[in-house]
């Protein structure tokens, strides 16, 4: 275990609640808290048994007044989250008592932890690898049960297991090649170019299998940005309200009622989807509405999917044509809204405009919403969403897998010349190094620091 100073942070959200937790980690954590804590039985906590709790009070050192009634828990190294001695103070929830106790802890000789520093110590002390560390923040940020399940799978080492098997196969191959090249006089089983090629091809197959999950995995982790667009008063806000099953957007007969972007999340069979209702796109002299239109265009450019809403009870006009032209290069679904009314849109017109993925709906009556949801899933997922197998959800992991695959392919090219078997080992080692970046075994320190800096305080 590495030699670190003692750190502390408030691990729960500041606000009113049942309890707040202040976490202290480091070899001085128990001694520091002992200065502030007075147990109900009058004993200090230096002889406290690990994995137990003690009841008492935190005492303000300057005034000797009781600050709060608390429970102290103690986890002894290396069997703690950070693999260091760790003490947690459980006090009453609330901003004032939590801050006052935290101030006393810092005054007693503890450094304020940086964002993600507890998890970083768990990684540096060897309790978890980098994929497991990243999974911690993914669990915290998960928006659906499916995204949480995927993050939990990563947190218990499922991704690491697959990566480590691949790395082990690569390093064994390197060892065989180098032994054959460096010690030809020894009585060693010689590895041939074709044998190495067969091993590398199998590894490439495994890399491709993992990479095939990455697009769906990214969506499970980060969700989809879905933008609703259309001219004013075609039913965009009604669609948003119908998808949310609540009245989130104002619905009136007055064009331009939605003047800004409205964003809400929905859970689509475990997929977190951010639905973005935009201001109607049209030419306007109203300054506020004009700003809303510009924001709408920005959201369209950033979107994973655009839902184009057309009013089927009215003929298409220049405003519709302008929007259709603007989104033609995006992935989109066309909704013919107000299907409960007589349709005045000619299907042949839609064919001429090369519009596709057309669904008839009535946002007001609720018709066609399930068809829309199924269409979204079909556009981004190949069949049913698999939750039991390993899914690559992290872009950093995907990029490392791509580099590993490229190195393996370069090794195969080198092996086409049977005399260049030793040259292939260089590329195989590069693949091994790339996979090590995923688990953190071969990653640069500054990149590791950047990853943990994105964590929240207290974690």
From Swiss-Prot:
NCBIfam families: mnmE_trmE_thdF (TIGR00450), PRK05291.1-3 (NF003661), small_GTP (TIGR00231). Residues 223-381 form the TrmE-type G domain. This is tRNA modification GTPase MnmE. Homodimer. Heterotetramer of two MnmE and two MnmG subunits. GO terms for biological process: tRNA methylation; tRNA wobble uridine modification. Pfam families: MMR_HSR1 (PF01926), MnmE_helical (PF12631), TrmE_N (PF10396). Keywords: Cytoplasm, GTP-binding, Hydrolase, Magnesium, Metal-binding, Nucleotide-binding, Potassium, tRNA processing. Binds 1 potassium ion per subunit. It is found in: Cytoplasm. It is an enzyme of class 3 (hydrolase). Exhibits a very high intrinsic GTPase hydrolysis rate. Involved in the addition of a carboxymethylaminomethyl (cmnm) group at the wobble position (U34) of certain tRNAs, forming tRNA-cmnm(5)s(2)U34. K(+) binds at residues 233, 252, 254, 257. The keyword Ribosomal protein does not apply. The gene is mnmE.
């Amino acid at each position: 275990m590495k030699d670190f100073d003692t750190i502390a942070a408030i691990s729960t959200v500041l606000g009113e609640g049942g309890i707040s937790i202040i976490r202290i980690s480091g070899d001085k954590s128990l001694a520091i808290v002992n200065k502030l804590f007075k147990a109900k039985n009058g004993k200090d906590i230096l002889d406290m048994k690990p994995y137990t709790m003690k009841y008492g009070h935190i005492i303000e050192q300057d005034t000797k007044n009781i600050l709060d009634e608390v429970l102290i828990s103690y986890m002894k190294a290396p069997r703690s989250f950070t693999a260091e001695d760790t003490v947690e103070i459980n006090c009453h929830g609330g901003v004032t008592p939590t801050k006052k106790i935290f101030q006393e802890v810092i005054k007693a000789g503890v450094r304020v932890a940086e964002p993600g520093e507890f998890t970083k110590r768990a990684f540096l002390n060897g309790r978890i690898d980098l994929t497991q560390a990243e999974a911690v923040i993914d669990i915290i940020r998960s928006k659906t049960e499916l995204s949480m399940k995927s993050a939990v799978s990563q947190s218990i080492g499922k991704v690491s297991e697959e990566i480590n098997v691949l790395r082990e196969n690569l390093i064994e191959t390197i060892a065989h090649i180098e032994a054959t090249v460096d010690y030809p006089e020894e009585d060693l089983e010689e590895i041939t170019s074709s044998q190495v090629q067969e091993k590398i091809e199998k590894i490439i197959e495994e890399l491709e299998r993992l990479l095939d999950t990455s697009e769906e995995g990214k969506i499970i982790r980060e969700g989809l940005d879905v933008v609703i667009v259309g001219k004013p008063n075609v039913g965009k806000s009604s669609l948003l309200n119908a998808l949310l099953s609540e009245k989130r957007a104002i619905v009136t007969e007055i064009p331009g009622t939605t003047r800004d972007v409205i964003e809400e999340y929905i859970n689509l069979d475990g997929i977190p989807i951010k639905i973005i209702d935009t201001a109607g796109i049209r030419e306007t002299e109203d300054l506020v509405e004009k700003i809303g239109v510009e924001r709408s265009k920005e959201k369209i450019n950033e979107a994973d999917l655009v839902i184009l809403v057309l009013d089927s009870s009215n003929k298409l006009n220049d405003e519709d044509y302008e929007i259709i032209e603007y989104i033609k290069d995006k992935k989109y679904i066309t909704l013919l809204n107000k299907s409960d009314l007589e349709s005045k849109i000619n299907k042949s017109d839609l064919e001429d405009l090369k519009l596709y993925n057309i669904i008839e709906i009535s946002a007001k009556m609720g018709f066609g919403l399930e068809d829309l949801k199924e269409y979204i899933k079909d556009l981004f997922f190949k069949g049913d969403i698999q939750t039991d197998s390993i899914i690559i959800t992290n872009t950093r992991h995907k990029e490392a897998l791509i580099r590993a695959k490229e190195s393996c392919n370069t090794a195969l090219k080198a092996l086409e010349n049977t005399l260049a078997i030793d040259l292939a080992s260089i590329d195989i080692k590069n693949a091994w190094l790339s996979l090590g970046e995923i688990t953190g075994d071969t990653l640069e320190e500054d990149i590791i620091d950047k990853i943990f800096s994105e964590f929240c305080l207290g974690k």
